[in-house]
From Swiss-Prot:
Name this protein carries in UniProt: Small ribosomal subunit protein uS3
Gene name of the record: rpsC
Keywords from the named record: Ribonucleoprotein, Ribosomal protein, RNA-binding, rRNA-binding
InterPro entries with a match to the protein in the record: KH_dom (IPR004087), KH_dom-like_a/b (IPR015946), KH_dom_type_2 (IPR004044), KH_sf_prok-type (IPR009019), Ribosomal_S3_C_sf (IPR036419), Ribosomal_uS3_bac-typ (IPR005704), Ribosomal_uS3_C (IPR001351), Ribosomal_uS3_CS (IPR018280)
Gene3D superfamilies found in the cross-reference section: 3.30.300.20, Ribosomal protein S3, C-terminal domain
Alphabetical list of Pfam families matching this protein: KH_2, Ribosomal_S3_C
Coiled coil feature spans: none
Length: 217
């Protein structure tokens, strides 16, 4: 089943944390739709800023949004102009006070979302799908990945019948829950239709923090 389960969802609560941290009862649906609107708006406004993860934490009439990006300078802008404009737009969208935290991704070649995004953009620029995948794998392994697997599916090279083709290097232990595996999928919009891009990156093992029990044991 490790091949079929979402690698991140399988590890939430073990070595991964939730991307949205809040609790609600009657307002649950409203908050969920608001989260989706925030994420969609940020992804549209910062499409070229290499934004990977968007974390949302809620307090009373306050929303804290943490943006993980490989290009913090582009998100912040000159003198903070871009982030101020983004904050004002999110305040208007949600009707609440929004705080924005910028978190820099120091190794973008180890982030599955950014690697998948790079492959997708290359496919849109008519780069050969095998070359795009192999280059991404080489960069990830040089950056310190223990293993990486990529897959591109769809009408490859304009073929009449859609198929999937992938490459891998190193190990990607999907069944090991303590394995830090980052996973993402992206879409490339080509003249022959959409191509799907999937990326799995194994970054090493993480031992879950031992929880304190009563009695200090």
């Amino acid at each position: 089943m490790g091949q079929k389960v979402h690698p991140i969802g399988l590890r939430v609560g073990i070595i991964r944390d939730w991307d949205a941290k809040w609790y609600a009862e009657k307002e649950y649906a409203d908050y969920l739709h608001e989260d989706l609107a925030i994420r969609k708006f940020i992804q549209k406004e910062l499409a070229d800023a290499s934004v990977s993860t968007i974390e949302i934490v809620r307090a009373v009439n306050k929303v804290i949004v943490s943006l993980h990006t490989a290009k913090p300078g582009m998100v912040i802008g000159k003198g903070g102009s871009n982030v101020d404009a983004l904050r004002a737009q999110l305040n208007k969208l949600t009707g609440k006070q929004v705080h924005i935290n910028i978190v820099e991704i120091k190794k973008p070649d180890l982030d599955a979302h950014l690697v998948g995004e790079t492959i997708a953009r290359q496919l849109e620029q008519r780069v050969a799908f095998r070359r795009a995948q192999k280059q991404a794998i080489q960069r990830a392994m040089r950056a310190g990945a223990k293993g990486i697997k990529t897959q591109v599916s769809g009408r490859l090279n304009g073929a009449d019948i859609a198929r999937a083709e992938g490459y891998s290097e190193g190990t990607v232990p999907l069944h090991t829950l303590r394995a830090d595996i980052d996973y993402a999928w992206e879409e490339a919009h080509t003249t022959y239709g959409k191509l799907g891009v999937k990326v799995w990156i194994y970054r090493g093992e993480v031992l879950p923090a031992r929880k304190n029990t009563k009695g200090g044991k």
